[in-house]
Amino acid sequence: MQHGDRNTPGYREGIMSAVSLRRPSAPKGFALSVHVVTWNVASAAPTVDLSDLLQLNNQDLNLDIYIIGLQEMNFGIISLLSDAAFEDPWSSLFMDMLSPLNFVKISQVRMQGLLLLVFAKYQHLPYIQIISTKSTPTGLYGYWGNKGGVNVCLKLYGYYVSIINCHLPPHMYNNDQRLEHFDRILESLTFEGYDVPNILDHDLILWFGDMNFRIEDFGLLFVQESITRKYYKELWEKDQLFIAKKNDQLLREFQEGPLLFPPTYKFDRHSNNYDTSEKKRKPAWTDRILWRLKRQPSQASPLASSVPTSYFLLTLKNYVSHMAYSISDHKPVTGTFDLELNPLMSVPLITMMPEHLWTMENDMLISYTSTPEFLSSSWDWIGLYKVGMRHINDYVAYVWVGDNQVSYGNNPNQVYINISAIPDTEDQFLLCYYSNNLHSVVGISQPFKIPIRSFLREDTLYEPEPQI
């Protein structure tokens, strides 16, 4: 992964890599829609409507997962102290906007100004396991986190996915340092104790952030004129990342959509004008979204028919900047993907079976079954949530599985929640089983209501269970 020798033979990539070369012959399962956001917010507060950024106004788009990376969040001492006790304002805003749409924040990692958030619709939670969250500081010789990367590694329906949000060194002359930090972040991400410890063997790496690559050779006036005329191709060919990929095999494995939008840096704040200060920095595509798919075998492996056939294909649908957002000197960039996969995990480890009808007047009896391979822990717990929960700790009540068990060892297992913990409301609820060993939700119920018995009629006691 070293970038020292840049004279090795290479070839020039086209606008889009031929994804079809990675397509195996295995049958397709289903598709997930993934929306990736990267934005250097330059210490700005979240005072704007983010509906367009999150594609909330696109009625034709049915998203399953949001992956959001911010750089240069305010990381002063006061901010760090307040974030230790409360959610930071940006995370709170994203949860405010996404939780009513049934997206749950499943992971968050922050290193000073870097923030990485992952949201998923709640029905996917039992099929997503958080493997680890890591931070790699590269500022001040690796001891300061103003530059570097933050990572979430997870298993998605049985596939390994690594997500990296980074902020690389600035300035035209620091290109070699940027590539060195790229390597350093990648080399720091190892996952000992798992069956795929090397990140390069993961099925997907999503890498994005303020990479700070600049446009070489051309002067300021030429770049500005090319942007005005939308002659982006000439500028793209002088982009430092584009040039580096020609001569580096590993970088070539990372794909990117075509840069058909204006350079995203540097703007005067609260405008769409490029830098008019004395420095007059040359515009550049500093904010990027890359991905790398592990090559899959072209034919199905001759394994037992009971073993699911691997199929995992990521297709970019849209790669754009959002010029309307002007609180920062960077414009945000988003990429929307279709992820087709044949699930390697199709049955949740825990299947929740709530009682047919609960009321506010009785303890809540919860039945569940587990798969043979599931290893429970005395620290496992079951949470009761309102539909629209923000994150896994946003429960209204919970019980330790070991403490409140009624029956164990013969499926179904049963636990109860005391009536005093049940909220007096007619909202819809969910039950989630949280595994301490896997640090993830491994079972979730369908939504249900808890009616007040005094308002029930006798003929309602045998109504069908509520549906999603």
UniProtKB/Swiss-Prot annotation:
Tissue-level expression: Expressed in the skeletal muscle and the eye.
What's the domain of life for this entry?
Answer: Eukaryota
Q: Which residue stretches belong to region Required for interaction with GPR78 and PAK1?
A: 318-448
Record localization: Endoplasmic reticulum; Cytoplasm
Extract the SMART domains matched here. IPPc (SM00128)
Cellular component GO terms, alphabetically? cytoplasm; cytosol; endoplasmic reticulum; membrane; neuron projection; nucleus; perinuclear region of cytoplasm; plasma membrane
Region: Required for ruffle localization, residue numbers: 340-468
Q: Which reaction does it catalyse?
A: 1D-myo-inositol 1,4,5-trisphosphate + H2O = 1D-myo-inositol 1,4-bisphosphate + phosphate; 1,2-dioctanoyl-sn-glycero-3-phospho-(1D-myo-inositol-3,4,5-trisphosphate) + H2O = 1,2-dioctanoyl-sn-glycero-3-phospho-(1D-myo-inositol-3,4-bisphosphate) + phosphate; 1D-myo-inositol 1,3,4,5-tetrakisphosphate + H2O = 1D-myo-inositol 1,3,4-trisphosphate + phosphate; a 1,2-diacyl-sn-glycero-3-phospho-(1D-myo-inositol-4,5-bisphosphate) + H2O = a 1,2-diacyl-sn-glycero-3-phospho-(1D-myo-inositol 4-phosphate) + phosphate
**Which GO molecular function, any one, fits this protein according to its record?**
phosphatidylinositol phosphate 5-phosphatase activity
Region of interest (Catalytic), ranges: 34-337
Q: Does the keyword Hydrolase apply?
A: yes
Which GO annotations describe the biological process of this protein?
A: cellular response to cAMP; cellular response to epidermal growth factor stimulus; cellular response to hormone stimulus; cellular response to insulin stimulus; cellular response to tumor necrosis factor; G protein-coupled receptor signaling pathway; glucose homeostasis; in utero embryonic development
Cystine bridges: which residues? Answer: none
Cross-referenced InterPro entries, in alphabetical order? Endo/exonu/phosph_ase_sf (IPR036691), IP5 (IPR046985), IPPc (IPR000300), SKICH (IPR041611)
One matching Pfam family is Exo_endo_phos2
What assembly does the database describe for this protein?
Answer: Interacts with GPR78; necessary for INPP5K localization at the endoplasmic reticulum. Interacts with PAK1; competes with GPR78.
The family assignment reads:
Belongs to the inositol 1,4,5-trisphosphate 5-phosphatase type II family.
Q: Name the PANTHER family on file.
A: INOSITOL 5-PHOSPHATASE, INOSITOL POLYPHOSPHATE 5-PHOSPHATASE K
Function of the protein = Inositol 5-phosphatase which acts on inositol 1,4,5-trisphosphate, inositol 1,3,4,5-tetrakisphosphate, phosphatidylinositol 4,5-bisphosphate and phosphatidylinositol 3,4,5-trisphosphate. Has 6-fold higher affinity for phosphatidylinositol 4,5-bisphosphate than for inositol 1,4,5-trisphosphate. Negatively regulates assembly of the actin cytoskeleton. Controls insulin-dependent glucose uptake among inositol 3,4,5-trisphosphate phosphatases; therefore, is the specific regulator for insulin signaling in skeletal muscle.
Which protein are we looking at?
Inositol polyphosphate 5-phosphatase K
Q: What gene is this protein a product of?
A: Inpp5k
